[in-house]
Amino acid sequence: MPSNRPSQYNRSAINRNTIATVARQDEALRLRRQGMAYIDIARQLGYTPNGVPRPQSAAEAVRAAERREQLSGAALANNAVAAVAATTAVAPVAAAAVANAAALTRTFGVEIEFFGITPRVAVDALTAAGISAASESYNHQTRAHWKIVTDASVTSRGTGCGSGLELVSPILRGANGFAETAKAVTALLNAGAKVDKSCGIHVHVGADGMTGADIIRVVDLYVQNNTHLDTVLAASRLNNGYAMKYNNAAMQNLRNALRRANGVNDIQSGARGLPRYMVVNVTSYLRHGTIEFRQHQGSLNGEKVVSWVKTIIAIMEKGASMQDGDVQDFGSLDAFTTALGLDDQTKTYLNNRATTLAGSR
Protein backbone atom coordinates (compact mmCIF):
# COMPACT_ATOMS: atom_id res chain seq x y z
CA MET A 1 0.00 0.00 0.00
CA PRO A 2 1.19 3.57 -0.60
CA SER A 3 1.79 6.49 1.67
CA ASN A 4 -1.86 7.35 2.15
CA ARG A 5 -3.21 10.50 3.64
CA PRO A 6 -5.38 10.63 6.77
CA SER A 7 -8.21 13.08 7.23
CA GLN A 8 -8.47 13.95 10.91
CA TYR A 9 -6.24 14.22 13.95
CA ASN A 10 -6.40 16.20 17.17
CA ARG A 11 -8.68 19.20 17.08
CA SER A 12 -6.92 22.04 15.31
CA ALA A 13 -6.69 25.62 16.48
CA ILE A 14 -6.81 26.82 12.86
CA ASN A 15 -9.69 29.23 12.24
CA ARG A 16 -11.35 27.82 9.15
CA ASN A 17 -13.85 30.63 8.81
CA THR A 18 -11.62 33.42 7.55
CA ILE A 19 -10.69 34.22 3.98
CA ALA A 20 -7.01 34.21 4.92
CA THR A 21 -7.25 30.77 6.49
CA VAL A 22 -9.06 29.34 3.48
CA ALA A 23 -6.43 30.83 1.18
CA ARG A 24 -3.64 29.32 3.26
CA GLN A 25 -5.33 25.92 3.22
CA ASP A 26 -5.75 26.09 -0.56
CA GLU A 27 -2.08 26.99 -0.91
CA ALA A 28 -1.13 24.06 1.32
CA LEU A 29 -3.11 21.75 -0.95
CA ARG A 30 -1.45 23.21 -4.05
CA LEU A 31 2.02 22.69 -2.57
CA ARG A 32 1.16 19.17 -1.48
CA ARG A 33 0.00 18.24 -4.97
CA GLN A 34 3.31 19.51 -6.26
CA GLY A 35 4.99 16.91 -4.05
CA MET A 36 6.12 19.09 -1.15
CA ALA A 37 6.50 17.33 2.21
CA TYR A 38 4.18 18.36 5.03
CA ILE A 39 7.05 19.61 7.16
CA ASP A 40 8.20 21.91 4.33
CA ILE A 41 4.65 23.18 3.81
CA ALA A 42 4.51 23.94 7.53
CA ARG A 43 7.73 25.96 7.29
CA GLN A 44 6.65 27.85 4.17
CA LEU A 45 3.13 28.71 5.34
CA GLY A 46 3.91 29.41 8.98
CA TYR A 47 2.48 26.39 10.75
CA THR A 48 5.25 26.80 13.27
CA PRO A 49 4.03 27.13 16.88
CA ASN A 50 6.93 28.17 19.10
CA GLY A 51 9.10 28.28 16.01
CA VAL A 52 8.83 24.52 15.40
CA PRO A 53 7.36 23.34 12.06
CA ARG A 54 4.26 21.21 12.70
CA PRO A 55 3.53 18.85 9.78
CA GLN A 56 0.27 17.74 11.42
CA SER A 57 -1.08 21.29 11.08
CA ALA A 58 -0.08 21.37 7.42
CA ALA A 59 -1.83 18.03 6.91
CA GLU A 60 -4.98 19.40 8.56
CA ALA A 61 -4.91 22.39 6.23
CA VAL A 62 -4.58 20.12 3.19
CA ARG A 63 -7.48 17.97 4.34
CA ALA A 64 -9.66 21.02 4.97
CA ALA A 65 -9.06 22.18 1.39
CA GLU A 66 -9.74 18.67 0.08
CA ARG A 67 -13.00 18.49 1.99
CA ARG A 68 -14.16 21.77 0.45
CA GLU A 69 -13.41 20.33 -2.99
CA GLN A 70 -15.32 17.16 -2.19
CA LEU A 71 -18.33 18.98 -0.81
CA SER A 72 -18.49 21.24 -3.83
CA GLY A 73 -18.57 18.15 -6.02
CA ALA A 74 -20.96 16.18 -3.82
CA ALA A 75 -23.79 16.14 -6.36
CA LEU A 76 -21.50 14.72 -9.03
CA ALA A 77 -20.19 12.10 -6.62
CA ASN A 78 -23.69 11.08 -5.63
CA ASN A 79 -24.68 10.67 -9.26
CA ALA A 80 -21.57 8.60 -9.95
CA VAL A 81 -22.20 6.27 -7.04
CA ALA A 82 -25.85 5.88 -8.00
CA ALA A 83 -24.80 4.93 -11.52
CA VAL A 84 -22.37 2.34 -10.18
CA ALA A 85 -25.06 0.90 -7.92
CA ALA A 86 -27.53 0.63 -10.78
CA THR A 87 -25.11 -1.38 -12.90
CA THR A 88 -23.60 -3.67 -10.24
CA ALA A 89 -26.53 -4.53 -7.94
CA VAL A 90 -24.83 -2.98 -4.89
CA ALA A 91 -27.34 -0.18 -4.27
CA PRO A 92 -27.50 -0.62 -0.46
CA VAL A 93 -23.74 -0.25 -0.21
CA ALA A 94 -23.66 2.77 -2.50
CA ALA A 95 -26.49 4.50 -0.65
CA ALA A 96 -24.70 4.15 2.67
CA ALA A 97 -21.46 5.31 1.07
CA VAL A 98 -23.09 8.51 -0.17
CA ALA A 99 -24.57 9.22 3.25
CA ASN A 100 -21.18 9.14 4.92
CA ALA A 101 -18.92 10.32 2.09
CA ALA A 102 -18.20 13.79 3.44
CA ALA A 103 -17.03 12.44 6.79
CA LEU A 104 -14.95 9.56 5.43
CA THR A 105 -12.26 11.25 3.40
CA ARG A 106 -9.32 9.22 4.67
CA THR A 107 -7.60 7.09 2.04
CA PHE A 108 -7.74 3.32 2.28
CA GLY A 109 -6.94 0.13 0.46
CA VAL A 110 -8.10 -3.47 0.71
CA GLU A 111 -6.51 -6.89 0.26
CA ILE A 112 -9.10 -9.65 -0.20
CA GLU A 113 -8.02 -13.30 -0.28
CA PHE A 114 -9.93 -15.85 -2.37
CA PHE A 115 -9.68 -18.97 -4.53
CA GLY A 116 -11.82 -20.95 -6.98
CA ILE A 117 -10.95 -19.15 -10.22
CA THR A 118 -7.74 -18.51 -12.13
CA PRO A 119 -6.00 -15.12 -12.20
CA ARG A 120 -7.03 -14.75 -15.85
CA VAL A 121 -10.69 -15.33 -15.06
CA ALA A 122 -10.48 -12.86 -12.17
CA VAL A 123 -8.92 -10.14 -14.32
CA ASP A 124 -11.44 -10.72 -17.11
CA ALA A 125 -14.33 -10.46 -14.62
CA LEU A 126 -13.02 -7.21 -13.18
CA THR A 127 -12.36 -5.78 -16.64
CA ALA A 128 -15.88 -6.69 -17.77
CA ALA A 129 -17.21 -4.80 -14.74
CA GLY A 130 -15.32 -1.69 -15.83
CA ILE A 131 -12.48 -2.05 -13.31
CA SER A 132 -8.87 -1.68 -14.44
CA ALA A 133 -7.04 -4.82 -13.30
CA ALA A 134 -3.97 -6.96 -14.00
CA SER A 135 -2.52 -10.27 -12.85
CA GLU A 136 0.97 -9.93 -11.39
CA SER A 137 3.56 -12.00 -9.56
CA TYR A 138 3.64 -11.49 -5.80
CA ASN A 139 4.79 -7.96 -4.98
CA HIS A 140 4.25 -5.08 -2.58
CA GLN A 141 4.11 -2.37 -5.23
CA THR A 142 1.23 0.09 -5.19
CA ARG A 143 -0.53 0.31 -8.54
CA ALA A 144 -3.06 2.65 -10.07
CA HIS A 145 -5.11 -0.45 -10.94
CA TRP A 146 -6.48 -3.42 -9.01
CA LYS A 147 -4.12 -6.37 -9.09
CA ILE A 148 -4.44 -10.12 -8.62
CA VAL A 149 -1.44 -11.71 -6.89
CA THR A 150 -0.75 -15.15 -5.45
CA ASP A 151 -0.99 -15.90 -1.72
CA ALA A 152 0.54 -19.11 -0.39
CA SER A 153 -1.48 -18.97 2.85
CA VAL A 154 -4.80 -19.35 1.00
CA THR A 155 -6.53 -22.47 -0.37
CA SER A 156 -5.28 -23.10 -3.91
CA ARG A 157 -8.25 -25.07 -5.29
CA GLY A 158 -9.33 -23.87 -8.71
CA THR A 159 -6.67 -21.20 -9.13
CA GLY A 160 -4.43 -23.19 -11.47
CA CYS A 161 -1.28 -21.77 -9.92
CA GLY A 162 -0.58 -23.86 -6.82
CA SER A 163 -1.61 -21.17 -4.35
CA GLY A 164 -4.53 -19.00 -3.40
CA LEU A 165 -5.12 -15.50 -4.74
CA GLU A 166 -5.44 -12.01 -3.37
CA LEU A 167 -7.23 -8.99 -4.80
CA VAL A 168 -5.30 -5.81 -3.97
CA SER A 169 -6.83 -2.39 -4.55
CA PRO A 170 -5.21 0.86 -5.61
CA ILE A 171 -5.53 3.86 -3.29
CA LEU A 172 -9.23 4.49 -2.63
CA ARG A 173 -11.22 7.19 -0.92
CA GLY A 174 -14.78 7.93 0.15
CA ALA A 175 -18.01 7.05 -1.65
CA ASN A 176 -16.41 6.17 -4.96
CA GLY A 177 -13.89 3.94 -3.20
CA PHE A 178 -16.62 2.10 -1.29
CA ALA A 179 -18.66 1.58 -4.45
CA GLU A 180 -15.65 0.35 -6.42
CA THR A 181 -14.73 -2.10 -3.65
CA ALA A 182 -18.25 -3.55 -3.64
CA LYS A 183 -18.21 -3.68 -7.42
CA ALA A 184 -14.89 -5.55 -7.48
CA VAL A 185 -15.83 -8.27 -5.00
CA THR A 186 -19.23 -8.70 -6.65
CA ALA A 187 -17.51 -9.24 -10.00
CA LEU A 188 -15.27 -11.96 -8.51
CA LEU A 189 -18.20 -13.63 -6.77
CA ASN A 190 -20.21 -13.72 -10.00
CA ALA A 191 -17.20 -15.22 -11.79
CA GLY A 192 -17.10 -18.16 -9.36
CA ALA A 193 -14.56 -17.01 -6.76
CA LYS A 194 -14.86 -18.52 -3.28
CA VAL A 195 -13.59 -17.94 0.26
CA ASP A 196 -13.06 -20.25 3.23
CA LYS A 197 -11.40 -20.18 6.65
CA SER A 198 -7.97 -19.70 5.08
CA CYS A 199 -9.05 -16.33 3.65
CA GLY A 200 -8.98 -12.93 5.27
CA ILE A 201 -9.53 -9.27 4.48
CA HIS A 202 -6.87 -6.71 5.30
CA VAL A 203 -7.76 -3.02 5.35
CA HIS A 204 -4.99 -0.42 5.09
CA VAL A 205 -5.78 3.12 6.20
CA GLY A 206 -3.55 6.11 5.52
CA ALA A 207 -1.51 7.29 8.53
CA ASP A 208 0.83 9.90 7.06
CA GLY A 209 1.07 12.92 9.36
CA MET A 210 0.08 11.00 12.48
CA THR A 211 2.27 10.95 15.58
CA GLY A 212 3.21 7.88 17.53
CA ALA A 213 0.71 8.90 20.22
CA ASP A 214 -2.06 9.08 17.58
CA ILE A 215 -1.27 5.54 16.42
CA ILE A 216 -1.20 4.22 19.99
CA ARG A 217 -4.68 5.64 20.59
CA VAL A 218 -6.03 4.04 17.42
CA VAL A 219 -4.69 0.63 18.42
CA ASP A 220 -5.87 1.09 22.01
CA LEU A 221 -9.38 2.02 20.82
CA TYR A 222 -9.55 -1.14 18.72
CA VAL A 223 -8.15 -3.29 21.52
CA GLN A 224 -10.46 -1.95 24.21
CA ASN A 225 -13.46 -2.63 21.97
CA ASN A 226 -12.18 -5.83 20.36
CA THR A 227 -14.82 -7.97 22.08
CA HIS A 228 -17.56 -5.87 20.46
CA LEU A 229 -15.93 -6.13 17.03
CA ASP A 230 -15.64 -9.89 17.54
CA THR A 231 -19.43 -10.12 17.51
CA VAL A 232 -19.51 -9.37 13.76
CA LEU A 233 -16.58 -11.64 12.86
CA ALA A 234 -16.43 -15.35 12.06
CA ALA A 235 -15.28 -17.69 14.82
CA SER A 236 -12.21 -18.55 12.73
CA ARG A 237 -10.94 -14.98 13.16
CA LEU A 238 -11.30 -14.68 16.93
CA ASN A 239 -8.04 -16.50 17.68
CA ASN A 240 -6.13 -16.45 14.42
CA GLY A 241 -2.37 -16.75 14.04
CA TYR A 242 -2.34 -14.21 11.21
CA ALA A 243 -4.29 -11.65 13.27
CA MET A 244 -3.35 -12.07 16.92
CA LYS A 245 -4.95 -10.01 19.63
CA TYR A 246 -3.07 -7.57 21.82
CA ASN A 247 -2.48 -8.54 25.43
CA ASN A 248 -1.18 -6.14 28.08
CA ALA A 249 2.44 -6.90 27.26
CA ALA A 250 1.93 -6.28 23.53
CA MET A 251 0.20 -2.95 24.22
CA GLN A 252 3.01 -1.90 26.53
CA ASN A 253 5.59 -2.79 23.87
CA LEU A 254 3.65 -0.63 21.41
CA ARG A 255 3.57 2.29 23.83
CA ASN A 256 7.26 1.98 24.57
CA ALA A 257 8.07 1.90 20.85
CA LEU A 258 5.92 4.83 19.71
CA ARG A 259 5.04 7.17 22.57
CA ARG A 260 7.88 9.58 21.80
CA ALA A 261 7.67 9.24 18.02
CA ASN A 262 6.68 12.53 16.39
CA GLY A 263 7.75 12.21 12.78
CA VAL A 264 7.94 9.62 10.01
CA ASN A 265 11.49 8.53 10.85
CA ASP A 266 10.67 8.17 14.55
CA ILE A 267 7.58 6.08 13.84
CA GLN A 268 9.42 3.89 11.35
CA SER A 269 12.20 3.31 13.85
CA GLY A 270 9.76 2.40 16.61
CA ALA A 271 7.58 0.19 14.42
CA ARG A 272 10.49 -1.80 13.04
CA GLY A 273 10.67 -4.19 15.99
CA LEU A 274 6.93 -4.74 16.41
CA PRO A 275 5.10 -7.93 15.32
CA ARG A 276 3.25 -7.96 12.00
CA TYR A 277 0.55 -10.59 12.48
CA MET A 278 -1.64 -8.63 14.88
CA VAL A 279 -5.27 -7.53 14.58
CA VAL A 280 -3.82 -4.05 14.05
CA ASN A 281 -0.49 -4.15 12.25
CA VAL A 282 1.62 -1.04 12.79
CA THR A 283 4.61 -2.36 10.83
CA SER A 284 2.76 -1.64 7.57
CA TYR A 285 3.75 1.98 8.22
CA LEU A 286 7.32 1.05 7.27
CA ARG A 287 6.52 0.13 3.68
CA HIS A 288 3.18 1.81 3.00
CA GLY A 289 2.63 4.67 5.45
CA THR A 290 -0.55 2.92 6.61
CA ILE A 291 -2.00 1.10 9.57
CA GLU A 292 -3.28 -2.36 8.59
CA PHE A 293 -6.31 -4.03 10.16
CA ARG A 294 -6.14 -7.79 9.64
CA GLN A 295 -8.93 -9.44 11.63
CA HIS A 296 -11.86 -9.76 9.23
CA GLN A 297 -12.57 -13.09 7.56
CA GLY A 298 -12.60 -13.50 3.81
CA SER A 299 -15.75 -12.32 2.06
CA LEU A 300 -17.00 -11.44 -1.40
CA ASN A 301 -20.17 -9.82 -0.05
CA GLY A 302 -20.00 -6.15 -1.03
CA GLU A 303 -22.13 -4.86 1.84
CA LYS A 304 -20.19 -6.85 4.42
CA VAL A 305 -16.80 -5.73 3.10
CA VAL A 306 -17.72 -2.05 2.81
CA SER A 307 -19.39 -1.99 6.24
CA TRP A 308 -16.15 -3.29 7.76
CA VAL A 309 -14.00 -0.84 5.81
CA LYS A 310 -16.14 2.06 7.00
CA THR A 311 -15.89 0.81 10.58
CA ILE A 312 -12.11 0.63 10.37
CA ILE A 313 -11.80 4.11 8.88
CA ALA A 314 -14.06 5.44 11.64
CA ILE A 315 -11.82 3.81 14.25
CA MET A 316 -8.84 5.62 12.73
CA GLU A 317 -10.76 8.91 12.73
CA LYS A 318 -11.96 8.50 16.30
CA GLY A 319 -8.71 7.26 17.79
CA ALA A 320 -6.60 9.95 16.14
CA SER A 321 -8.90 12.73 17.36
CA MET A 322 -9.30 11.58 20.98
CA GLN A 323 -7.30 12.74 23.96
CA ASP A 324 -5.11 10.11 25.62
CA GLY A 325 -7.40 9.68 28.62
CA ASP A 326 -10.58 9.40 26.55
CA VAL A 327 -9.95 6.01 24.93
CA GLN A 328 -12.34 3.52 26.52
CA ASP A 329 -14.39 0.36 26.23
CA PHE A 330 -17.76 1.66 25.06
CA GLY A 331 -19.60 -1.32 26.53
CA SER A 332 -21.44 -2.71 23.49
CA LEU A 333 -21.27 -2.87 19.72
CA ASP A 334 -24.13 -0.41 19.34
CA ALA A 335 -22.58 2.11 21.74
CA PHE A 336 -19.21 1.74 20.02
CA THR A 337 -20.53 2.25 16.49
CA THR A 338 -22.53 5.24 17.72
CA ALA A 339 -19.40 6.75 19.25
CA LEU A 340 -17.60 6.18 15.95
CA GLY A 341 -20.25 8.21 14.12
CA LEU A 342 -21.11 5.49 11.62
CA ASP A 343 -24.13 6.07 9.39
CA ASP A 344 -27.39 4.38 10.35
CA GLN A 345 -27.31 1.84 7.54
CA THR A 346 -23.86 0.59 8.50
CA LYS A 347 -24.80 0.44 12.18
CA THR A 348 -27.95 -1.51 11.37
CA TYR A 349 -26.01 -3.95 9.20
CA LEU A 350 -23.43 -4.56 11.93
CA ASN A 351 -26.05 -5.02 14.64
CA ASN A 352 -28.00 -7.47 12.48
CA ARG A 353 -24.80 -9.33 11.68
CA ALA A 354 -23.97 -9.60 15.39
CA THR A 355 -27.46 -10.92 16.14
CA THR A 356 -27.20 -13.54 13.40
CA LEU A 357 -23.80 -14.76 14.57
CA ALA A 358 -24.86 -14.83 18.21
CA GLY A 359 -27.57 -17.30 17.30
CA SER A 360 -25.07 -19.66 15.69
CA ARG A 361 -22.40 -19.67 18.39
Give residue spans per PLM region:
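Basic, amphipathic alpha-helix used for nucleic-acid engagement in HTH/winged-helix/SANT-Myb modules
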Residues: 1-23
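Short, amphipathic alpha-helical "recognition" segments used to contact nucleic acids or chromatin
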Residues: 19-36
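Short, charged amphipathic recognition helices of the HTH superfamily
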Residues: 33-45, 199-202
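Short, basic interhelical loop/turn and adjoining N-cap
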Residues: 39, 44-64
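Short Lys/Arg-enriched helix C-cap and helix-to-coil transition segments
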Residues: 63-91
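C-terminal accessory/tail domains of diverse enzymes
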Residues: 81-194, 208-361
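Hydrophobic alpha-helical segments and helix pairs
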Residues: 193-199, 203-205
